[in-house]
């Protein structure tokens, strides 16, 4: 497999009243297509900043970011947004569903920014990914009518709807109880087994062990890169009744 993502000496600084705060220091990293990677470390170590750069929500101060063989380091905000909408799927800790849109409408939202796709095609694609996360029976419901676990599965469907090259998940189980967290992690196992590339930020060591590879950050630096040769085996997909969550 070829490298889907390659970071070369990536640094990121923020400036407040001309005072520089360096959040990332010389990150070198390669993620191969089809890998499941966990990004770990204490709060404030730079995990979310790195994920923002990977997701093209921000640009590095220094270094090169190669995504799908394209150097995206120096692109404008609009250029980054265009690539992001096609190649990257996000799953956030707080779900980030729009309260006055239905489940189906929330999932279709990323498709609405693409030209040349009809509403009928958007509906069909939304139905397809909602079936994948076992939420197709809730298409007409609103977020307030769903449990936390159900909302996060809708958020995963939204991340999948564009057939992204990579799924970036920032503490996807952070707002969930243990049962719902396990259901979401099991869903990630399933998606990875189907070929998805996933990079997940997590504080939970057990969650990190489900990934093939664990990256550890400390003070803005990548200090560990471990292959999880004895990673936890994925829970059987029928071991949890997702519809009950």
Give residue ranges: language-model regions:
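ABC family nucleotide-binding domain
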Residues: 3-217
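C-terminal end-of-chain micro-motif
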Residues: 1, 37, 242-245
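Conserved beta-strand-loop-alpha-helix hinge in the C-terminal portion
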Residues: 221-245
